């Protein structure tokens, strides 16, 4: 996606896109509220003057002006505002009275003189009904109604700004708690603190399990498919949804309806609040949608979880945008100003933003991500460009552009870090070899001593061929056991990029060399030395992560002469996979790691010919006569994961279960591990899932 990223960078650097928007300011200015509320209240009474015009009486008739100043002072004093705020009302009066004073600006000293003079003669307004000839103080109850009427709309916007920050603080709190929990992994303190029945109950019921049964495996049928969060992710999202709902439901309406009726207030207040909250989602969506290697390192939250939060934040941003758009559109119709605003830049950019974000969310459905991933990525980036630009145009005269600026800052920082990772790795040659019918082995010579990947980490590979150079996919990376300074990536052929690589290799007689770029590494390696027992479970092509981690743990045990128990279990149905990883499996055995390989290939019935008689041998016999890799197989059929986990935990005080495989395989392992956590509250059982699906 290099081209699309360059396009996005150009959009951000375009002069029009970087035009400085109006800054977001506090709207509740009490000097303004006091002046406006007092003007409304005083102008509802008749002073002894015949001057005409807006605020003419208050500006030109000194008893009225003195009343205005005293009224404003009383309003500000009741809110304990400073003398400086009171003096700001002088400049507001100068603005309102400019037409009557011509080019003359009344000084603060003159206003204080008028105020002092009025203090000598001021009376309560209730004592006179008409033709007022002296300064008066308005009825407090009547004045307060006007104060509240002006305060409500401004306070609503200010609260929206505070609530937008509140949403961000909620997620900062989530990240902080995750970071504290994660950094306990660097010591045995975590096992001491959390090794009890209460912790086991919480972890077994709410932290580890999927929401129902599926997490990695999609649910639904046909177009309506999707991924379900874990229970912990669901709890985090549920807290966010509750907070979001509360922040959309608290308003200070003017029940006296002095400035507008209740319907208009509901529409405007709700629309303003929703619009501000929508903008507050910008930095969170970009932050969680990036590769976030730093965020993962700090918090221990997997990329899959960040993408889950990214998706749900995007959906609720769409909800906020929809409320904002429908509310203002309906208000424009009922107040009969739609025809005057519908073609303005403000409304046009708002319509464009709504259309774009709707299409963006639609093409983000899991159906497109699964079946048309490259289409999804292209449309996602291009539509994001359009949405950001439309929102920028929509708000640059109003304020709230700071949210988009923060969003751009996170995006640029993420891209810079990714480019640095690519630059550090360099552009080495890679050797590609076709292994069997559905696998490609990629061997890459590391060209930089600064680049290092830990077991279980993955990289995004770019193959520099004309038709595919712009595509990248994540692959788990391993250090070669044959050549120092060489990385090994084994690719399972599916559709898209991997299919094109397979076709190119078939044209090249199964082998070729090409230059590659690598972005990463991402993910993190688990601190296996903190556990008494280690269980690595792999299914099919999900073996690289658990296998490399098992080898590293075995070497640490050997060098430290420790008594850590390590078991490696691999369920495989493809002999080609066994051949690809034969050297690594042999290393496991050399390290005396308990290795169990279960072959789940289908049994085939052949004819009863003499050749068929050989084919009708037991599966074990056929394998032993057809493959050198068959000698590594220890069992046939599916492994009993439940028994394997129970066996691993029974002889240890702490257990780490690491799993990677197909969707159903890892979901089942997660469920069974959570079950064991509940059963063994006196032991520390941790589960690490290497499989990632988004």
UniProtKB/Swiss-Prot annotation:
Q: How does it sit in the membrane?
A: Multi-pass membrane protein
Residues the record lists as binding NADP(+)? 520-523, 660-661
Q: Which EC number(s) does the record attach to this protein? A: 1.16.1.9
GO MF, any single term: metal ion binding
Binding of heme 1, residues: 310, 380
- UniProt binding sites for FAD: 473-479
What is the reaction catalyzed?
Answer: 2 a Fe(II)-siderophore + NADP(+) + H(+) = 2 a Fe(III)-siderophore + NADPH
Positions of the Ferric oxidoreductase domain: 274-408
Entry cofactors: FAD
Where in the sequence does glycosylation occur per the annotation? Answer: 117
Ranges per topology, Cytoplasmic: 185-222, 289-311, 369-371, 425-694
- InterPro entries per record: FAD-bd_8 (IPR013112), FAD-bd_FR_type (IPR017927), Fe3_Rdtase_TM_dom (IPR013130), Fe_red_NAD-bd_6 (IPR013121), Ferric/Cupric_Reductase (IPR051410), FNR_nucleotide-bd (IPR039261), Riboflavin_synthase-like_b-brl (IPR017938)
Q: Which residues form the signal peptide?
A: 1-19
Q: Does the keyword Electron transport apply?
A: yes
- What residues bind heme 2, as annotated? 324, 394
Q: Where is the FAD-binding FR-type domain?
A: 409-528
Report the subcellular localization.
Answer: Cell membrane
Q: Name one GO cellular component term.
A: plasma membrane
Function recorded in the entry: Metalloreductase responsible for reducing extracellular iron and copper prior to import. Catalyzes the reductive uptake of Fe(3+)-salts and Fe(3+) bound to catecholate or hydroxamate siderophores. Fe(3+) is reduced to Fe(2+), which then dissociates from the siderophore and can be imported by the high-affinity Fe(2+) transport complex in the plasma membrane.
What the record says about family reads: Belongs to the ferric reductase (FRE) family.
Q: What is this protein called?
A: Ferric reductase transmembrane component 5
